[in-house]
Amino acid sequence: MPGHRGAPHLPPWVCGLCSMDDFAEGGLSLADDILLEDYPYEDDCICTPDFTTDDYVRVTQLYYEGVGMQYKDYAQSEKNLEYDICNIWCSKPLSILQDYCDAIKLYIFWPLLFQHQHSSIISRLHPCVEAIRSRAAEISLKKLQHLELMEDIVDLAKKVANDSFLIEGLLKIGYKIENKILAMEDALNWIKYTGDVTILPKLGSVDSGWPMLSIFFTEYKYHITRVVTENCNLLEEFRRHSCMQCVKQGELMKMRGNEEFAKEKFEIAVIYYTRAIEYRPENHLLYGNRALCFLRMGQFRNALSDGKRAIVLKNTWPKGHYRYCDALSMLGEYDWALQANIKAQKLCKNDPEGIKDLIQQHIKLQKQIEDLQGRTSNRNPIKAFYESRAYIPRNSSAPAFRTSLNFVETERGFRKTKYRMANGGGHQNQKVADEALKGDDCDCHPEFLPPPSQPPRHKGKQKSRNNESEKPSSNSQVTLQVDLKSILEKQFSKSSRAAHQDFANIMKMLRSLIQDGYTALLEQRCRSAAQAFTELLNGLDPQKIKQLNLAMINYVLVVYGLAVSLLGIGRPEELSEAENQFKRIIEHYPNEGLDCLAYCGIGKVYLKKNRFLEALNHFEKAKTLICRLPGILTWPTSNVIIEESKPEKVKVMLEKFVEECKFPPVPDAVCCYQKCRGFSKIQIYLTDPDFKGFIRISCCQYCKVEFHMNCWKKLKTTTFNDKIDKDFLQGICLTPDCEGIISKIIIFSSGGQVKCEFEHKVVKEKAPSRPVLKQKCSSLEKLRLKEDKKLKRKIQKQEAKKLAQERMEEDLRESNPPKPEEPEETVESAQSCQFLDDRILQCIKQNADKIKSVVLNTSTLLKELLSWKVLSTEDYTTCFSSKNFVHEAVDYVIGHLIQEKNRVKTRIFLHVLSELKELDPKLAPWIQRLNSFGLDATGPFFTRYGASLKELDFNIVTFLWSEKYGHKLGSIEGKQLDYFCEPASVMEARCLIWLLEEHRDKFPALHSALDEFFDIMDSRCTVLRKQDSDEMPFGCIKVKNKGKKKKPKDSKPMLVGSGTASVTPSSETVTPEDHNRRNSDSAGPFAVPDHLRQDVEEFEALYDQHSSEYVVRNKKLWDINPKQKCSTLYDYFSQLLEEHGPLDMSDRMFSEEYEFFPEETRQILEKAGGLKSFLLGCPRFVVIDNCIALKKVASRLKKKRKKKNIKTKVEEISKTGEYLRVKLPLNPTAREFQPDVKSEAAAEDVTSIPGPADSSAPAAEDLKPQLDSDSSSGSASEDSRLEVVSPDLPTPLCEDASPSPTPAPEDAKPTYWTQSHLVTGFCTYLPFQGFGIAQSRPAYINMVPSLSQFTSIYTPLANISSEYPMPRSMPVVPSFVASERADGNAAAYFESHRLNTENASDDHTASETQILEGPLGMCVKSQSSTADARTALSEPEGNSRHSGSSDSLWEASLENVSGITDVPPAPSVAIQVSRSLIHQEVNTEPYAPFERQQGDLSQKEKECHLLREQLQVACEECEQMELRSSQETRDLEEKLQRHAEENKVSLPELQWALGKLDREIKKWHQEKKEIQERLKALKKKIKKVINTSDMSAQKNDGLDKECESQPDQSLGISSALTDEKAKVEESVRKGKELYEESQQRAVAAEVSVLENWKEREVCKLQGVATQAEACLKSLKLMNSDSAAYPDVECDILSWETFLSTVTEEIENTKCQFEEQIKAIKSGSRLSDLSSVQVSELLFPACSMIHPQLLSESSRHEDHGLVACVDSMTGAVLNDPYVGPDSGCSEEVPELSLGSPTHHPEGAQQLEVKKASQVSPSEQNPEADEKPSGQATRSSQSQKNPFNSIIEHLSVIFPCYASSELSGFIKKVRNKSKNSFSGLSIEEIVERVTEHIVEEQKKKKPNPGKDKKTSEAHPAASVSKSSPSPPLAAAGPSAKTKGQKKDDVPAPDGNSCQICHEIFKSKNMRVLKCGHKFHKGCFKQWLKGQSTCPTCGSSDLLSEE
C-alpha cells in the first residue's frame, strides 16, 4: 500500500549493481522471515486462506466497529484535492497518459512477474506470486489466468486515461481503500461503467477478485498522485535507472546467448540469457529469446512465463505474442492460444511484418482446433466445449444444460450457502459475515460473489504436458461456469420465480442442442451432430423426462438422431455404436413405434459393412413394420420433419436397399482362410469400413488365392513359420490338387492401391500360331479398286481437316463479337467445336461420370482446387451451399471448367485429381496417364523453344510465379532456364508453361509455341474423327491398320533383332499376336499433325525409293520357341520371294540379307544344312533350275523352261561324242576358260603348295563354327575367277542335270554352309558300284548349276580298309565350276552312316569330285588320285596370294577338309566323258600335237586369255592414273602459290604475335611468381590454422570428456550457485532493510543530540536568568533602605537589563537549534552543520548587595539553582556526542565571573559533601568513566555517581531542587536497607523516580509549592515542548528495563516510547506530558497501569 512506502522510493527494475553497494547486512524482521519460510508453494492453489485473511478481517472489523463513520470528515477534506488532481492529470496529452499507464502497469506487474519480494503488500495480497523462488520461472496455468485477468483490469485505465469522470472515481476508490473503507460496490460499478462487460464474470469466478481490485485502485491512485503532486515523470524514472556498465554486460551476455542459440545449444543459451536479464531485467527481447529457447527444449511452461513477461514489457511486440501463443498451443490450450492471437493482432496492427506471422499462426491454430474436433476423444465433446468456454462466458448467459437439469432435480432442497468475503477466507467469523451482509446491502452484490463450489479452471485438452489438468469435482459430473446471478437467486430465494427462470433456460438450451444436431445432420456434418446428440443424452434422464414436459418419443428420437449421426461417420467403431443404439430403441422402447426405423438403421449398418445377407433380413423386417410408424415425425421442440418417418419414402428407400442386397456387387477378393473371422464375411470389398488390405497369390495355371491381411499373417505364423512374402514365389500353388508354380504376388494396401508386387515369369511353350498372310491381288482390277479406295480416303481426310479448320475460324469470329441473343443450339454446337482445340477438356467431359465415381473425397478436391485458384471463393461457397453437395461437387467443377474454357485450369484439375490419395484404384492409372502427357511434353517443348524462352525477362516471370504459385510451390528466384530443363524439375517446368499461358498477353512471341504445346504436344488422348462416319460415336471407331502397300519389286523391311534370333514380318504379314497387340495399343485412328506432315512426306518418299536398303530389327518375337522362329523365317522368305519372284541361290539378295542375320538365325540355318535345305523343309518352297521359288508359282516356271527333256539331250551328246572330240574346235570364250586368278602365278602355285598330309577327319559338328566364321569374309571382285581343273582334261562337254525328286537322307545332307550367298541346289544321284566293298547307300551331291561362279564341292568317300586292294582307279563324278564370285566356294562334306568310320588308319583314300559344267551342259567322268586332290586343294591357296578377300575362306577349307590321306600317288587324269559313258571304256590319251597330257591346251588358252585381260586393265589404269596425277599436280601448284602469298602476309603478323607472346609470357611469369609466393604464404597460414584447429580440437575433446565425466558436478555447482544466489539476495534484502532502519535511527539520534544540546544551553541560560532574578529580588528588598544603599536603583536597572539580555539569548539559542533540527530532518548531516554560537554573558557589577541577605533570602532557591546548573554542566561534559571543537563554544560561563560573592562555589562544595555520603561500593565504575579532555573549568576533576544520579533526576523532575532530590535518594536507600550495591545508575534513577511519583500521589497540592512550580515552569514547558521523551534525554546510554544494550534504537519523537518503533502511520497517541505511544501499545499498558509509562504522570488526556 502507499502508506507503507518508504521515503527513498526506487523503481523495482533498478539493477543490482546500481543499488547493492548501499545496503547493509541484516535488518530483516522476524515476521518477514516467518512469512518467507511458512509461505506454501501450491501449484494449483488460487489463493491461500492465510494469505489475505488477517488483513481483511481487521479491515472488516474496523469498518463495522464505527471507523466508517469517519468517512464524512474524510470526504470533506479530500474532495477538492481529488478534483484538482484529476483535472491536472486529464489536461495532459492522451499519448503521454497512455505511456504513463504502461509505466504504471510495469510497477504493478513487476513484483508479480519479475521480482518476488514478499515483503511488499502487492505480492502478499496477489495470488500470482510464487513463494519458492527456485520455481519462479514457471507460471502455472491457473496463475496465468489470474495474471491475464489482472492485465485486463489494468488495461481498463489505459482505455479511459483522459476521462475525468472515471479517473476521479478511480482516485476516490483508491482513497477509500487506503483508509480502510470497504468500497467493493464502487469498484465493481467503476469497472461496469468502463464498458467492458467481460471482466465482471471473470472476477466473480475468482476467489481473490477483491485483492486484485484493491491493488489496481491503490496503485493507480498512488502513481497518479505522484505524477500530479510531485511532478514525477514515470517514463524518465523508468529509463534512467540503468547504468552503462549493466547495459554493456547485458548486451555481452545477450550476444553470447545468440551465439549459443545459433549452435543449437539451447541450455547454455538459456544461462546466458538469464545472466543478461539479471543485468537488464526491463529488456523484452531477452525474455523473448529465452522463451524461444525453452520452446526448442520442450519446456513449454517456462516459455509461457517468459512470453508473458515479454508481452507485459512491450505489448506491441509481435514475436512475444507469437511465442506466447506457441507455448499455449504446445500445452494443449488451443482455444486460449487462439484468443491470445486475436488480441495480439489488435495490439500489433501497426506492424505489417509481424501481423503476417500472427495471421499464419491464427490459421494454423484454427486448423489444429478443427483437427481436434474431427477426432473422437474419450471425453464428452460437448463437455469439453463448455469447459473451454467456462472461463470466458461471453455468449452464454444461461447455465449449462447438465447443471440446469441437476438443479431441476434438487430445486426444492437447496440450503443457504455460507457467505464468504471476496478474499477467499473461508474460516472467518460467521457472525461478522452476517453483520456485513445485513449492514450494507449495496457493497456486496450477489452478482459478483463466487459460487460455493470449486472455482473453475480454464480447460483446453484434457491433460497438458505438465499434467496440470484438474480432476473433476466429486459433487457434479462436470465443472462448468454458471451465471452467478441466477445461481445466487436460486440459493438465497425460495420463490418460484427462480425455478421458472431455470426451466426456461433449460428449454432454451435443449432447443439449441437439438437444432445443432439435426442441422448438422442435414448438412452431413455427422460428427457435429453426434456431439450435439451425445450432449443431449448425457443431460437427459429418461426417467425424469416428464419434468421437462417432454414425451418419451422425444427422447427416443434423440437416440435415433445419435445413431444416424454415427452411421453417417461410417467408421467401424461408430457403426458398432450405431447398431447398439438402434438395438436399444428396439429392446427398451418397443411401444414408441420406431421399430421400423431401427431395423432400417441396422440394415444400413450392415449395408455399410457390405454384409448384404444380414442387411437384407433387416430390411425385410423393416418393410413388414412400416404400418407401425406413428406418422410423420418432427425433431423434438421443432417443426422440422424427419424425412425417414414418411411411410411412402421409407417404402421406396427399403425397396431400393432390398434390390441392392439381392444383387450385390462382385467382391474384389474372397478370403480363402478356413478360419476367417472377418465379421462373418469372407468377401472382401475395397469399400469395407474395416478394410485393411488383402493379398492375392497367382500361379502359372491361373489360380488366384486371396486372403485378408490378418488371415494371411495368421496363416503364415501357424503354417509357414513367418515366411517372407517374397519367398513364396516359385513355390507350389496353395490351391489343392494344383501343380502350378506361384508366379505373382500382389499386396493391396488399406487404400485399395497396390502396395507391392512380386512376380516371377514362368515361360510356357506354346504351339506356333500360323501367321496371317496377306495375299496379293491376283487381278489388275482389284489393284485398281484398292488404289481408288486409298485415293478416296486421302481426299476425305483432307476435306475433314479443311472443314475442321473452317469451323474453328468461324468459332473465333463468333467469339470476338459476342451476341447476347444467340440461340442455344448455336452455342452448343460452337462449344462442341471448341472442344477440338482442347482435347483434354473434351476427354474430361466425355468421361465425367467416370471421374465422378473416382472421387471419393470431394471436400479435399474442392480445397485443393481453391488453393490452386481454379475455383474462386464465390464458386467454392456456391458449391458448398448446395444441399446435395457431395454428389454434385464434381459435376459443378466440370461444368465450371467447360464454361471457363481455360486450358490451364483444366490441366490443374487433372493434376489435382491425380494427386488425390482417395481415388478409385480402377480408374486412377487412367487419370495419372492423362496427367503424364503434359509432363512428358515439357522436355520437347523446352528443347524446341529454349532459345525463345531464354529471351524472357525472368524477373517478371519470378514475380508472376510468386503471385500464382508461391503458396503451393517453392520460389524460383535466382534460377535460370536450365533449372527447368532438368528431369527432376518436370513439375516446375509444366507450371512455368501454365504460367506463360495464363499471362500470354505479356508474351506475344510465345503464342504459337503455347498453342502447339496445349493443342498437340499435351493432347495425345484424342484425335480427329473419320469424316466419312461422323455419326459414329467416338468410342466405337473401328481400328484399322493403314499400312502402306509396297510395290511388287520393292523389298519389304524386316525386323531382325541384332542380339536375339528374331525376325518380324512386315505389316502385310500379321500374326495373331501382333494383331492383338496393335488393337490394344491403338486408341483410335491416327492423323498426322500439321507440324509433322512435311517430314512424313519426305520420309515416305525416301522410304519408297530406298525401301530395299532399310533393315528393321525387332527383338520381341524371338523369346518364344524355335518352332516359332522357323515359322517366322519361312514367312520372311515367302514375302521375299513373293515380292521379287524366284531367285537363284547365288542371288545377291540372299547374301546381303544373310549378313545381317543374328547368330541364332545362322545356327538354325546351319543345323538344317544350309539355306536350301532349310527352305526345302517347308512345303511352301520348291527348287526349279537351282532357283528357289514358291510352290504356287512353280507351274509358271515349268512352262518357261527352255530345256524340257534333259535326259534326251544327254543321250544325243553321248552318241555324237566322238565326232565332237575330233571335229568341234574349242571355244575360247567358254565358261570353263574364264580364269579365276589375276596373275600368271596362279598356275605355278597349284602344284607348289602341298596339301595337308596328316589331317584327320573331324566330325561335321566341329567344322561348323570354323566355317561360319569364314562366311563373314568379304567377297572379291567379279573379275577374279578360279577354277580347279586337271591339266589333262579335254574340252568338257556337259549338260544340265535333272533334279531328283527324292529328298536326301539325314546323314547325307550338307554339314555346313560356308557362304551366305552360296546355297545348295537340287541333288544329283551318284551311285557307287563294284569297288569290292559292301553295298552302301547311294550318296547325294548337292549341285548348283545356275551359279555363275566357281564352286568346289568336296565329297569325302568312305574310309577303305587296307585289306581291300584297289585294282583300278576309282571313278568319281567330274567337277564343275558354278560360281561367279572369286571369293566364293561352297564345300559340302558328307559321310554315310553305314561306312566304317571307326577304323581310322593312315591308308585312308579320298578322291575329289570336280563337276565341271561345259557350254553344252555335258558332264564327264574323271578319276583323280590323292595327289590330284592335293593339287586341287592347293591351287586356290596359291591364288589366294593375289585375292586378299578370299584368304580366310580358303584357309578354312584347307584346314577343315576331311578324308585326305597319305596314299601313294596314282596317275591322275581328268576324265572328260559324257555322263552316259561313265562306265564304258573311252580313249583318254592326250591330244597331240597340242598337249602333252590331257588339259594342257585348255590351260594355255586360259592363261593367254587371262594375260590379255590383265594387260587391258593395266593400260586403262595407267591412263586414269596419268590423268589424276596431272590434275593433282596442277592443284598442288596452285595451293603452293597461295600458301607462299599467305606466308608473306602472315610473317609480320607472326612476328608481332611472337613479341606479344613474349611480353605476355614475361607478365605471366611475374604473376606466377607472385601467385607462388602468395600460395606459399597461404600454405603456411593453412598449416598454422590446421595446427591450431588440431590443438583446439584436442582441447575440445578434453573438455568434452571432462564435461561428460562430470555431469553431476555441474548439477551440484549449479545447485550450490542457486543456494548462494538465494543467500546473497536474502542478504541484500536484509541489508537494504537494515540500511533504512539505520538511517532512520541515525536521523533520530542526531535530532536527539541537537535537542539535548538545546536543552543544555537553555538550561544554562535559564540558570543565569534565575540567579539574576534572585539578585534583582534581593536588590528590590534592599531598595527600602535607600540610605544604606544609595546606588540600589542603578543596580536594579543594570540587573533588569542583564535579565532581558539573557531572555533574548535564550530565544535566539532555541531558534538556532530548531533550524538545525529541521535541516537534519530534511537530509543534512550533523557534521556538515555549523555549530550554534552562544554569547558569553557577564553579571553586572553589583557591590551593593548584602551577602547575608542574599544567602538568607535565597538559600533554598539558590542552592537548587546552582545544583541544577552544575548538573547541567556535568551533563554537557559527559555527553559523548560533543567533540572537543564544539564543546568550547557551547560551554556555559561560570557564575563566579563578575560576581562579588562565591555562592556557586559554596553550592558545589555542598553537593560534593552530599555526594561523599555515598559509599564507594555503591558507585558504578561505568558511571565514573569520563572521556579524556572533558573537564570543567572548576576544580572538580571527576564526577561521582551521585552527581550523575542528581543530573538524571534533575532532567526528569526539573521542578525539584538538588537538595530535595538528595532527600529522595536517601529515602530510597533507606528502603533498600541502606545499600545500592549491585544496582546501576539507571536502576537507581528508576527507583527514585517511582518513589517521587508515589510521593506526588500521596501529597495534595501545596500552596507553598505553587511558587516553586511557577518559578520552575519555564523549565517544565521546555521539557514538555521537546519532541523527544524525557527519559531519552539522559543520553544514548540510557536503557529501559529488560532491553539489551544493542537492540534499542535511539529514542526519537517519531518513535513509540514503549516498543521504540518508528511511527509509520497516524495510529499514535500523544499524552498531556508530551510522550507519544502507539495506540495498541498504550492500550496494552493501560490494562495494568493508569500512569504514563515514561514519566508516571496520571493526567492521560489526549491532546490530539
Swiss-Prot record:
Kindly give the InterPro entries that the UniProt entry links to this protein. Answer: DEATH-like_dom_sf (IPR011029), TPR-like_helical_dom_sf (IPR011990), TPR_rpt (IPR019734), TTC3/DZIP3-like_helical (IPR056872), TTC3/DZIP3/RBM44-like_helical (IPR056870), TTC3/DZIP3_dom (IPR043866), wHTH_TTC3 (IPR056871), Znf_RING (IPR001841)
- UniProt pathway: Protein modification; protein ubiquitination
Q: Which reaction does it catalyse?
A: S-ubiquitinyl-[E2 ubiquitin-conjugating enzyme]-L-cysteine + [acceptor protein]-L-lysine = [E2 ubiquitin-conjugating enzyme]-L-cysteine + N(6)-ubiquitinyl-[acceptor protein]-L-lysine
Spans of repeat TPR? 250-283, 284-317, 556-592, 596-629
Q: Which GO-annotated molecular functions does the record name? A: ubiquitin-protein transferase activity; zinc ion binding
Q: Name one Pfam family in it.
A: zf-RING_2
**What are the boundaries of the region Disordered?**
442-478, 804-828, 1041-1087, 1233-1308, 1423-1448, 1806-1839, 1894-1947
Zn finger (RING-type) start-end: 1952-1991
What does the record say about PTM? Phosphorylation on Ser-397 by Akt is required for ubiquitin ligase activity.
Q: EC no.?
A: 2.3.2.27
Which residue stretches does the UniProt record annotate as biased composition, category Polar residues?
1059-1070, 1829-1839
Gene3D superfamilies xref list:
Death Domain, Fas, Tetratricopeptide repeat domain, Zinc/RING finger domain, C3HC4 (zinc finger)
**SMART domains this protein is in?**
RING (SM00184), TPR (SM00028)
GO cellular component terms, semicolon-separated: Golgi apparatus; nucleus; vacuole
Question: Which regions are flagged for Low complexity bias?
Answer: 1268-1277, 1912-1934
- Which purpose does this protein serve, as stated in its record? E3 ubiquitin-protein ligase which catalyzes the formation of 'Lys-48'-polyubiquitin chains. Mediates the ubiquitination and subsequent degradation of phosphorylated Akt (AKT1, AKT2 and AKT3) in the nucleus. Acts as a terminal regulator of Akt signaling after activation; its phosphorylation by Akt, which is a prerequisite for ubiquitin ligase activity, suggests the existence of a regulation mechanism required to control Akt levels after activation.
Q: What is said about its interaction partners and assembly?
A: Interacts (when phosphorylated on Ser-397) with AKT1, AKT2 and AKT3 (when phosphorylated). Interacts with CIT. Interacts with POLG. Interacts with HSP70. Interacts with SMURF2.
Name used for this protein in its record: E3 ubiquitin-protein ligase TTC3
- Which organism encodes this protein? Rattus norvegicus (Rat)
